[in-house]
Amino acid sequence: MHQELIRELAMITDEERRILEGKQEIDPQLYTEKKEMVVDSAKLLKKGKLIQVRPHTRFVHFPAHTHNYIEVIYMCQGTTTHIVNGNQVVLEQGDLLFLNQNAVQEILPAGEYDIAVN
């Protein structure tokens, strides 16, 4: 992968900055307005868009959740560990993971150089 793109994707996001400053959990309001953890496409997609590519949030455990859309994860560099329907899945550079709306996913903390997009 082109190093300029990797540098761009590796930049610390506002959410990651809060995590690094001591907030040791994700902010559910960034992902859903429901009590149960169903990641809502309306919270992530720009108005009028049907697809959005964003860097995976690193440095924090992402608790078990589902999505109201199909999620595609591409591992650009490093590794990430996912628990999908109770099974451990380790993504390495170049891997793709497709998750339907019924898949229950949990993500273990990723490091600074573990770069994925979803």
Where are these regions (language model features)?
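Generic protein-terminus/edge-of-domain signal
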Residues: 1-79
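N-terminal regulatory/effector-sensing and dimerization cores
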Residues: 49-118
